[in-house]
């Protein structure tokens, strides 16, 4: 909403309140000026490491292309980074298994451990049958918020897709856990947290966005700060 903010202060406070085993999902893209990307996404990821957090994964949100983002010599931009920072080993990692296996129903020998989980294999001795669904990769094809179902849309100018928030919450937390969004915006994270049975705290300085969020979530259950 045009408000300035202090990344380093936000990062420090996120690390301060994060419990051991907790996870930060940091979604960011670079701005382009005078034909050069800012590189701030990588600087921010490395700063989380300097704060003593682990950089568990560098994920990609793959979305429809939206022009060259200020640089007509570059390829169209169709991705944002999703950095996963943790305080120690993550307490929860409910990795989603909804990737369709092209080789579903066939069998393979010698698949074990992580590979078996990746392919959704069922152990039948030395031969394992490949399941219909395997683990997602760290590249998520989720589209844009404008392509979501009508009930998941909002009047915010740049909301994240509902299923992006939902799927990260489902992966890194369990029912009853507390989810914090320091840039709550129109309440997408809050709605996803409520849908999945998580507690939620949202911080937002723009009263217009708070009003939008209040229309999307039940205030008797979730309180926006």
List each language-model region with its residue ranges.
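Core catalytic lobe of class I
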Residues: 1-212
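Short, conserved SAM-binding/catalytic segment
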Residues: 195, 214-225
């Amino acid at each position: 909403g045009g408000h300035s903010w202090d990344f380093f202060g936000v990062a420090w406070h996120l690390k301060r309140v994060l419990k051991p085993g907790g996870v930060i999902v940091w979604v960011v893209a670079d701005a382009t000026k005078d034909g050069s990307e800012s590189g701030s996404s990588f600087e921010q990821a490395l700063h989380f490491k300097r704060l003593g957090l682990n950089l568990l994964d560098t994920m990609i949100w793959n979305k429809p292309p939206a022009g060259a983002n200020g640089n007509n010599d570059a390829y169209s931009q169709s991705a944002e980074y999703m950095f996963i920072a943790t305080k120690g080993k993550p307490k929860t990692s409910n990795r989603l298994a909804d990737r369709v296996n092209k080789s579903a129903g066939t069998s393979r020998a010698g698949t074990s451990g992580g590979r078996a989980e990746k392919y959704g294999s069922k152990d039948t001795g030395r031969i394992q049958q490949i399941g219909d669904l395997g683990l997602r990769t760290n590249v998520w094809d989720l589209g844009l918020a404008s392509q979501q179902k009508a009930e998941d849309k909002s009047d915010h100018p740049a909301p994240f897709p509902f299923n992006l928030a939902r799927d990260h919450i489902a992966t890194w937390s369990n029912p009853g856990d507390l989810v914090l969004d320091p840039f709550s915006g129109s309440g997408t994270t809050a709605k996803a947290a409520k849908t999945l049975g998580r507690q939620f705290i949202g911080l937002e300085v723009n009263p217009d966005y708070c009003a939008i969020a209040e229309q999307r979530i039940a205030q008797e259950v979730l309180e926006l700060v």
